Curated annotation (Swiss-Prot):
The chain crosses the membrane at residues 32-52, 76-98, 113-133, 179-199, 225-245, 289-309, 318-338, 345-365. It comes from Chlamydomonas reinhardtii (Chlamydomonas smithii). Signal peptide: none annotated. This is Cytochrome b. Its main location: mitochondrion.
């Protein structure tokens, strides 16, 4: 008798990771889930090791990071593995989300899969932001000041929330301690949400490029797609190694190599690159409250996508074309978010933001509905 039949936990793992029936026509764009899980495990491991050397105090935080880099054996590799691992984690998850949008992977009956995925993305963003503050560099400090002050846009309770986040009347030691605590805790919540995400997916099974719910063309995941995922994992490990060992500061900001100074504001305050598209939307709207509302509306639209969209754009020509314009729009917003505000970048940012909402709130439901009606009319004739 096999061991996994004797031990319940091994039986569950075998059912969901080895014997799980998978459509045989999946391509490499379906590697995102396993690669994201690999990066989450890497981030948790390196984060726990970094926490052993980090000091959560405004007077020692920056020095403790420098001590880790110079005095701890392999400390530099550990720090850069965590920093660049966050970037690769977001790249993998963004590609995973974009694949889901393209193929309509969140369409009914898989709404819970999509919604739980958006929740995971939100928790990732919060975790990464508060982690960016911990080195207590110049950009960390001022980024925390700018982003936490957005809470004042909330009517009535906004200032109270901001002061609670700060733990006082400015970003200081209580803020750093709270962020350190949250940053250590949230990855474990992410792991739990990931398990729920997988469980929701396995309830109805994986989608496929054709969008056909077939129960006949299925093969076990472990024997075949495990090897395919291994190829993706090796490629990701190669990119990861190149970043860590050859270009460790490529995706970072040089101002964060300077200790935080509350009396000197950086010329251009920017978050990490994977938040730049959100930052560009926020900057394109002059009113703070409306900017925060716009960000909330973006994520509300993502939550509502299984209900307002009518499947992916793989076989819908207009939807597919609009999808690629949406992707170009997000990339342009990312570029704009990393540049200083000028009349031209401000105008282009407003145009890109307007198109983003036009795509999410108008194109998704309307064009999908019109294409469906046209297809039904063609079949009837």
């Amino acid at each position: 008798m096999r061991m996994h039949n004797k031990i319940q936990l091994l039986s569950v793992l075998n059912t969901h990771l080895v014997a799980y029936p998978t459509p045989m026509n999946l391509n490499y764009s379906w590697n995102g889930g396993s690669l994201a899980g690999m990066m989450l495990a890497s981030q948790m491991l390196t984060g726990i090791l970094l926490a052993m050397h980090y000091v959560g105090h405004v007077d020692y935080a920056f020095a403790s990071v420098q001590h880790l880099m110079t005095d701890v054996p392999s400390g530099m590799i550990l720090r850069y593995a965590h920093a660049n691992g966050a970037s690769l984690f977001f790249i993998v998850v963004y590609l995973h989300v974009l694949r889901g949008m393209y193929y309509g992977s969140g369409a009914q009956p898989r709404e819970i899969v999509w919604i739980s995925g958006v929740v995971i993305l939100l928790v990732m963003i919060i975790t990464a932001f508060i982690g960016y503050v911990l080195p207590w560099g110049q950009m960390s400090f001022w980024g925390a000041t700018v982003i936490t002050s957005l809470a004042t846009a909330i009517p009535v309770v906004g200032k109270h929330i901001m002061y609670w986040l700060w733990g006082g009347f400015s970003v200081d030691n209580p803020t750093l301690n709270r962020f350190y605590s949250f940053h250590y805790t949230l990855p474990f919540i992410l792991a739990g949400l990931s398990v729920f995400h997988i469980a929701a997916l396995h309830q109805y099974g994986s989608t496929n490029p054709l969008g056909v719910n077939s129960q006949s063309s299925l093969i076990s995941f472990g024997s075949y797609f495990g090897a395919k995922d291994l190829v993706g994992a090796l490629f990701l490990a190669l990119v990861f190694s190149i970043l860590v060992f050859f270009y460790p500061d490529l995706l970072g900001h040089p101002d964060n190599l300077i200790p935080a100074n509350p009396y000197s504001t950086p010329q251009h305050i920017v978050p990490e690159w994977y938040f730049l598209w959100v930052y560009a939307i926020l900057r394109s709207i002059p009113n703070k409250a409306m900017g925060v509302l716009a960000i909330g509306l973006v994520f509300a639209s993502l939550f509502a996508m299984p209900f307002i969209g009518l499947g992916g754009g793989k076989f819908r020509i207009i939807t597919e074309w609009l999808y690629w314009t949406f992707l170009a729009d997000v990339l342009l917003l990312t570029w704009l978010g990393g540049n200083e505000i000028t009349p031209i970048t401000s105008f282009v940012g407003q145009c890109c933001t307007a198109y983003l909402f036009f795509y999410l709130l108008v194109c998704q439901p309307l064009v999908g509905y019109l294409e469906t009606q046209f297809a039904h009319g063609t079949q009837t004739n």
